[in-house]
Amino acid sequence: AAGATTSEPADPRRRVGAANAAARVQPTRDGYMNAIQQYPWADGALYQVYTAPGQVTDIALQEGEQLVGPGPVAAGDTVRWIIGDTVSGSGAMARVHILVKPTRPDIATNLVINTDRRTYHVELSATSATYMASVSWTYPQDALIALRGANAAAASAAPVFAGIDLAALNFRYRITGDRAPWRPRR
């Protein structure tokens, strides 16, 4: 009916559960590049990562991104999960890797990773054998900013005068006087 609104569940736990379910991002076949699941970055998404005992899953952050704060990586269950971090590369190409490994199957926890650029929300699930070797992200907003910058640079490099017939220009003249650095060459 026109003007009708969808009512929310009265129980706030059901509202939270529904919001979390809507925010979950599952791995997709098209998202894989070799063994790396590449998720498109979105603020507030809950990225699903599947792990297995005896296997390390690498959560790779963006190049140049750095962990920040006194506890930049926090997990809900730090007893049954082994979580560490390392860095590959150096300088602007340095890349932080969060390494996770469950101690047993059929457990789950969440992981919050705070960096100088964003906060990642990850839900970890342990299976008996199936695991994701590596997870990383693509950053559509960063690509859009870079594209806008490239377009602005191209526009500023474009010729000032468009539509001039170069064949109609007259170069039969002579310039005399001092040789100033701004003096025309033709």
Describe these PLM feature segments:
Residues 1-186:
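A general "mature secreted/periplasmic domain" signal
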